[in-house]
A protein has these predicted regions:
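Radical SAM enzyme [4Fe-4S]-AdoMet core and its adjacent flexible, acidic
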Residues: 13, 33-38, 81-84, 104-279, ...
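Flexible mid-to-C-terminal extensions adjoining Fe-S/redox cofactors in radical SAM and related proteins
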Residues: 1-6, 28, 277-278, 282-373
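A structure-centric signal for secondary-structure junctions around beta-strands
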Residues: 6-7, 19, 151-153, 266-267, ...
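Short, flexible loop/turn elements at secondary-structure junctions
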Residues: 63, 91, 158-160, 340-343
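A broadly structural signal marking compact, well-ordered functional cores
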Residues: 55, 91, 247, 251-255, ...
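Conserved alpha-helical substructure of the radical SAM core
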Residues: 1-109, 120, 124-128, 132, ...
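Residue-level signal for mature regions of secreted extracellular proteins and peptides
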Residues: 11, 15-18, 255, 274, ...
């Protein structure tokens, strides 16, 4: 095991329950999944057996963390252990009392999922919610965090689709007005035919943008800084970035994506599902169906241990989990998205290199188009 192969960021799913039903949510594609809350003994086991190397505890997953009755005490426990504590919420349950409790418990960063900045479009995407309510909660959160003698950050997680991509230009203004410190933009996961029609990466996954070096026949285009608000500059940049015939460099930095690479593994992350099962990444947390180019792919959950039977440190250091991380770092998987999407891709049981599940070559996170905070 490499000396730097240590667990640094632990994702905790407090609950699989959610008070919303967003039309593009990954939950819509779940197959035979049980819904429930994390039990106190499961959370306690995670906290008492996690390796000392853990720096950040992130409360998120596929449910709404604030729906768990003990979420404040969970945050307090993680903070008392000297860990940086972050939490991702849809913001609807973040009233003044809950804000005060979370800040008092030691929350270091709050992430809010906001996928539209227009009231009508927000209501279409996030059913049972109103953007005005979330904005009110942000204002109150900012009022309370400004009175603290420590820094608490605010982030926004934005899922971009064809129907809301035009709102990206509004994010800097929204973020400045509402004192947002960081914005994480991810593409949408195609869970059905409708969301498949909303994706903005149909072509980019075919390109070798993540390769270490461009092909000999591919020219390098070096761009200087420009007035990007100028329509002529915008059109020129759009044209360059929409072709795979060259490698584009901006101020000496290559515009690329980290394809065939797993951020979850490379950055030392792990996920604890609400029931105590430990998964290496978000993609392997649930059984689900994805749609891509008129084809369905079955994604199957994969776990390397259960906190009911082992400690988190034992699970992380187990030979099979360590070997999986080695394979993913070397990315010994077939390049599914640069192929014709064969039966192996659809079933997800093996790949064309003979790897058994999990076959990470068919993962959109590894292609650099899906991103989690």
């Amino acid at each position: 095991m490499p000396s730097d192969d240590c667990l640094k960021k632990l994702y905790i799913e407090p609950t699989a329950c959610c008070n919303l039903r967003c039309k593009m949510c990954f939950r819509n594609s779940w197959k035979n999944e049980i819904i429930g809350d994390m039990r106190p003994e499961t959370f306690r086991k995670a906290m008492t057996t996690m390796p000392d190397s853990v720096e950040t505890v992130f409360f998120g997953g596929m449910g709404e963390p604030l729906a768990h009755p003990d979420i404040v005490e969970m945050v307090r426990t993680a903070s008392s252990l000297g860990k940086r504590v972050e939490l991702l919420s849809n913001g609807t349950l973040l009233d003044a009392r809950r804000t005060a409790e979370l800040l008092d418990a030691g929350l270091d960063m709050l992430w809010l999922s906001i996928d539209a900045l227009d009231d009508g479009r927000y209501a279409q995407i996030r059913r049972n919610s109103q953007l005005a309510l979330v904005k009110e909660h942000i204002v109150e959160f900012n009022r309370q965090r400004a009175r603290l003698d420590r820094t608490v950050r605010l982030g926004v997680a934005f899922v971009v689709m064809k129907s809301n991509a035009h709102e990206l230009a509004l994010l800097p203004y929204f973020s400045t007005y509402y004192k947002v410190n960081e914005v994480n933009i991810s593409n949408v996961i195609p869970t059905d035919e409708h969301t498949a029609s909303e994706v903005l990466y149909n072509n980019v996954v075919d390109w070798g943008l993540g390769d270490p070096a461009p092909m000999e026949s591919s020219p390098r285009i070096h761009l200087p800084l420009m007035d990007w608000q100028d329509p002529a500059a915008q059109e020129g940049l759009r044209s360059l970035l929409s072709t795979s015939m060259c490698s584009v460099y901006l101020s000496g930095q290559r515009v690329s994506r980290a394809a065939r690479h797993c951020r979850f593994i490379d950055e030392g992350m792990a996920f604890v599902k609400f029931d105590g099962h430990v998964s290496p990444c978000m993609s392997l947390l649930r059984n689900a169906t994805l749609y891509w180019r008129q084809k369905q792919r079955e994604t199957r959950s994969h776990f390397f241990g259960d906190l009911a039977e082992q400690g988190l440190d034992e699970i992380w250091n187990a030979p099979d989990y360590a070997d999986f991380r080695r394979r993913v770092r070397n990315f010994e998987f077939s390049p599914c998205y640069r192929c014709s999407l064969c039966e192996n891709w659809e079933q997800g049981l093996t790949d064309c290199y003979g790897n058994d599940a999990p076959t990470c070559g068919g993962c959109l996170w590894s292609e650099g188009v899906i991103s989690c905070p």
